């Protein structure tokens, strides 16, 4: 992708946020790349196997941008009105990647897969959360040869949420992904709205091997008001 980097701490359209998952997965497989403007909130590749005869899902970032929402990436540990965290299983460690903003928390087991990536965005401008949740799984469904295992739109710790799990093809490999987005609201009087996204990715043929670690991360994922 042709690169265009935005200031790391400025407010930016959510497209910059949502595609970081794709960049992170691509970078793990292929080495550093320069992200473009759209490339930080989408979990799907730029091409997909969705038939043109069916209605193509609209990605979350595209919906949010269409209603004028912008997002400011913030470090999970810097939040004063929310607790957002994931555990680090034994053998996992923080992973640095030039394609990922410093405010993104990423851990991995070894130098490749599996990985877990946690992102938080402070959202600006009001929007319909129920409508946004309809687009919460679109990026995954647009992935090449995506096969869904399960999904849910049940609340997470009392906050609106969407989850999807499945497998897809990327750079000649079959990957397994678990992805949850949460729209928490901070404490009054500000009642700041956020987008939290956790994406866990492994090689599909190693998903069982790493299942206990992945389940521990999912079980220990916290999004809670302080």
UniProtKB/Swiss-Prot annotation:
A lipid is attached at residue 30 (S-diacylglycerol cysteine). InterPro entries: Lipoprotein_LpqN/LpqT-like. Keywords: Cell membrane, Lipoprotein, Membrane, Palmitate, Signal. Residues 1-29 form the signal peptide. Transmembrane segments: none annotated. One of its GO terms (cellular component) is plasma membrane. It holds the Pfam family Lpp-LpqN. The keyword Cell membrane applies. It is found in: Cell membrane. It comes from the Bacteria. It is a lipid-anchor. The keyword ATP-binding does not apply. A lipid is attached at residue 30 (N-palmitoyl cysteine). This is Putative lipoprotein LpqT. It comes from Mycobacterium tuberculosis (strain ATCC 25618 / H37Rv). The lineage of its organism: Bacteria, Bacillati, Actinomycetota, Actinomycetes, Mycobacteriales.
């Amino acid at each position: 992708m042709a690169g265009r980097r935005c200031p790391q701490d400025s407010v930016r359209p959510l497209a910059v946020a949502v595609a970081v998952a794709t960049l992170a997965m691509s970078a793990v497989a292929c080495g550093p790349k320069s992200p473009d403007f759209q490339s930080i909130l989408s979990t799907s590749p730029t091409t997909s196997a969705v038939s043109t005869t069916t209605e193509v899902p609209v990605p979350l970032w595209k919906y949010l941008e269409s209603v004028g929402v912008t997002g400011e990436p913030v470090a999970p540990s810097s939040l004063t009105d929310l607790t957002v965290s994931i555990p680090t299983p034994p053998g996992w460690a923080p992973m640095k990647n030039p394609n990922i903003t410093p405010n993104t928390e990423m851990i991995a087991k070894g130098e490749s897969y599996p990985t877990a990536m946690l992102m938080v965005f402070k959202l600006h401008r009001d929007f319909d959360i129920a409508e946004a949740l309809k687009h919460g799984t679109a990026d995954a469904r647009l992935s090449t040869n995506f096969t869904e295992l399960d999904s849910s739109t049940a609340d997470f710790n009392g906050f609106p949420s969407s989850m999807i799990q499945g497998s897809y093809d990327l750079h000649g490999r079959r990957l397994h992904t678990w992805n949850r987005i949460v729209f928490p609201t901070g404490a009054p009087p500000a009642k700041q709205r956020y987008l939290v996204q956790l994406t866990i990715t492994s090689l599909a043929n190693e998903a069982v091997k790493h299942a206990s670690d992945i389940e521990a991360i999912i079980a220990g994922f916290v999004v809670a008001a302080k």
